[in-house]
From Swiss-Prot:
Protein name as catalogued: Translation initiation factor IF-1
Family: Belongs to the IF-1 family.
Superkingdom field: Bacteria
GO MF: ribosome binding; rRNA binding; translation initiation factor activity
SMART domains: S1
Subunit structure: Component of the 30S ribosomal translation pre-initiation complex which assembles on the 30S ribosome in the order IF-2 and IF-3, IF-1 and N-formylmethionyl-tRNA(fMet); mRNA recruitment can occur at any time during PIC assembly.
Length: 71
């Protein structure tokens, strides 16, 4: 079950309250994403314009989890 994730790259468009972000994916779709625990634990800052990797569930393609921020 845990392997049913879709990984896709995107660009952070906007920062929202409660550590949520609007991310524009490579295919042009805009989704709502939150930060994964490891990024939060290591105090990695995510700003608008950053390129990120997002994990999405195949059941809800409007939400995701940011798992990596590119340098």
């Amino acid at each position: 079950m845990a392997n049913d994730v879709i990984e896709i790259e995107g660009k952070v468009k906007e920062t929202l309250p409660n550590a949520m972000f609007q991310v524009e994916l490579e295919n042009g779709a805009v989704i709502l994403a939150h930060v994964s625990g490891k990024i939060r634990k290591n105090f990695i800052r995510i700003l608008p314009g950053d390129r990120v990797t997002v994990e999405m569930s195949p059941y809800d393609l409007t939400k995701g989890r940011i798992t990596y921020r590119f340098r």
